[in-house]
């Protein structure tokens, strides 16, 4: 870090003046949902790892992930700062931890998607809310912690370019006594932000409306570092980007570089980009094992109401064919609970999944997330504001055409039909024996136990 620019000299000077290093506790809370969330292998929390990477230069850091079995202490006397990351699903738990630490006189920081979207609510449970990404407010925040003069909200006036992004230090997660609970897929980030601004999405608020990206060489260097650490080429990566293909030229150049490394990877990709056969060819050649695709609905009226122009129903089968041709599995997302949904929506979805042999279908109920335009539109119809149930699996409001009872009846029936043994064999026959098979049989067991009451 340069000692001649902006606030950095003050930060370095303050750090040098400290007689001892302040102690930080970083917390990843678990959720309280009854559904299959935060169970089994969980992804390493990249955002919290980034906080640890930044903070460890000036402070002593303890890293706890409650999802893996780490215990959050009742007594915070050993720490000066307690920093908690939160999304809507674990917000109540994050608030409980924050309240406890705040009552003990600690500096409490709460950041993440939910506190960014509902800053006033989150501010009741902490000293300071980190609005959006911490990287863009880090110097200001660290200086204030040294001085002991905190602001109620830290919000960047300008987001930093990703060219200055510090590579994440995964040792904070990997050195945990419960590290075996983490998925073998290593989270990686190449881009941030999205200018599209869909009414149901939080990305533009959290990461900005401009599309930012890291230099390709830096992304590849991070992959090489993991290959060296693990002593093998076929390291598996999961891109955390919301819209990595927004700039096709950048994405294609990144894949060309990855093809030379021999890695394996998966990502969320926009539907319209996958219509091009050359994209699937390069994705397969660069080691793509699975694409996560938001099909959302087989109802054209619903797609139109979502303003999701990237989804063209007439191209769905071509997209699937392109990926399957290059042995890329599909994690397909389907949402139910729209006002225009009918029983025909479920049948059309079942037919599409079975005919196109979608390897890993994921079904959710329409959930208006707080802070989004869609939430404001639906607020008067939402059944409750119990954040523990905002997991996209609980019934949030009654759709006009179908009604709540029929919605849940058909939702459960569809899951059972898609994940019954014979359906799994039809969809998966001849495909590689890997974790996708395992997940299908886990879902077979899970869906047999479903009842409407679980979704209320």
UniProtKB/Swiss-Prot annotation:
Pathway: Porphyrin-containing compound metabolism; bacteriochlorophyll biosynthesis (light-independent)
Cofactor needs: [4Fe-4S] cluster
PROSITE patterns: RADICAL_SAM (PS51918)
Subcellular location: Cytoplasm
Domain Radical SAM core: 178-405
Keywords: 4Fe-4S, Bacteriochlorophyll biosynthesis, Chlorophyll biosynthesis, Cytoplasm, Iron, Iron-sulfur, Metal-binding, Methyltransferase, S-adenosyl-L-methionine, Transferase
One GO MF term attached to the UniProt entry: methyltransferase activity
Gene3D superfamilies: Cobalamin-binding domain, tm_1862 like domain
A cellular component annotation (GO) from this entry: cytosol
UniProt cofactor note: Binds 1 [4Fe-4S] cluster. The cluster is coordinated with 3 cysteines and an exchangeable S-adenosyl-L-methionine.
CDD domains with a match to the protein in the record: Radical_SAM
Enzyme nomenclature, EC number: 2.1.1.331
Pfam family, any one: Radical_SAM
Residues reported to bind [4Fe-4S] cluster: 194, 198, 201
Catalytic activity line of the entry: 8-ethyl-12-methyl-3-vinylbacteriochlorophyllide d + S-adenosyl-L-methionine = 8,12-diethyl-3-vinylbacteriochlorophyllide d + S-adenosyl-L-homocysteine + H(+)
One GO term (biological process): light-independent bacteriochlorophyll biosynthetic process
Superkingdom of origin organism: Bacteria
Major localization listed first in the record, in broad terms: cytoplasm
Record family assignment: Belongs to the radical SAM superfamily.
Function: Involved in the biosynthesis of the major light-harvesting pigment bacteriochlorophyll c (BChlc), which confers a significant competitive advantage to green sulfur bacteria living at limiting red and near-infrared light intensities.
Name of the protein: Bacteriochlorophyllide d C-12(1)-methyltransferase
Source organism (scientific name): Chlorobaculum tepidum (strain ATCC 49652 / DSM 12025 / NBRC 103806 / TLS)
């Amino acid at each position: 870090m340069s000692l001649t620019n902006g606030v950095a000299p003050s930060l370095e000077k303050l750090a040098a003046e400290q007689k001892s290093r302040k102690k930080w506790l970083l917390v990843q809370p678990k959720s309280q949902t009854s559904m299959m969330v935060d169970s089994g292998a969980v992804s390493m929390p990249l955002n919290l790892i980034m906080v640890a990477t930044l903070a460890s230069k000036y402070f002593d850091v303890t890293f706890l992930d409650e999802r893996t079995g780490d215990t959050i202490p009742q007594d915070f006397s050993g720490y000066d700062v307690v920093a908690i990351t939160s999304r809507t699903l674990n917000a109540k738990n994050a608030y409980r931890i924050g309240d406890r630490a705040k009552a003990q006189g600690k500096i409490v920081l709460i950041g993440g998607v939910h506190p960014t979207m509902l800053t006033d609510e989150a501010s009741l449970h902490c000293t300071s809310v980190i609005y959006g990404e911490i990287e863009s407010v880090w110097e200001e925040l660290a200086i204030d912690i040294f001085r002991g003069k905190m602001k109620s909200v830290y919000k960047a006036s300008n987001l930093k370019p990703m060219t200055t992004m510090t590579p994440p230090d995964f040792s904070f997660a990997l050195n945990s006594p419960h590290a075996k609970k983490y998925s073998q897929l290593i989270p990686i980030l190449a881009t941030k932000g999205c200018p599209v601004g869909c009414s149901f999405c939080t990305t533009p608020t959290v990461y900005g409306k401009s599309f930012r990206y890291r230099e390709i060489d830096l992304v590849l260097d991070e992959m090489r570092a993991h290959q060296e650490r693990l002593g093998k080429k076929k390291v598996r990566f999961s891109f955390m980007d919301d819209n990595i293909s927004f700039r096709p030229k950048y994405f294609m150049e990144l894949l060309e570089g990855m093809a030379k490394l021999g890695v394996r990877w998966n990502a969320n990709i926009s539907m319209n980009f996958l219509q091009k056969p050359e994209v699937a060819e390069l994705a397969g050649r660069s080691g793509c094992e699975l694409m996560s695709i938001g099909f959302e609905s087989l109802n054209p009226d619903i797609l139109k109401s979502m303003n999701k122009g990237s989804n063209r129903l007439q191209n769905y089968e071509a997209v699937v064919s392109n990926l399957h041709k290059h042995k890329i599995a599909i994690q397909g997302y389907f949402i139910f609970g729209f006002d225009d949904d009918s029983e025909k929506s479920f049948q059309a979805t079942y037919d599409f999944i079975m005919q196109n042999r979608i390897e890993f279908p994921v079904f959710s109920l329409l959930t208006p997330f707080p802070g989004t335009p869609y939430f404001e539109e639906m607020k008067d119809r939402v059944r409750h504001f119990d954040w523990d149930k905002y997991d996209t699996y609980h019934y949030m409001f009654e759709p006009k055409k179908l009604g709540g009872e029929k919605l849940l009846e058909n939702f459960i029936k569809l899951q059972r039909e898609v994940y019954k043994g014979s359906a799994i064999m039809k969809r998966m026959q001849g495909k590689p024996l890997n974790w996708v098979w395992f997940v299908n049989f886990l879902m077979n067991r899970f869906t047999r136990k479903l009842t409407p009451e679980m979704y209320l």
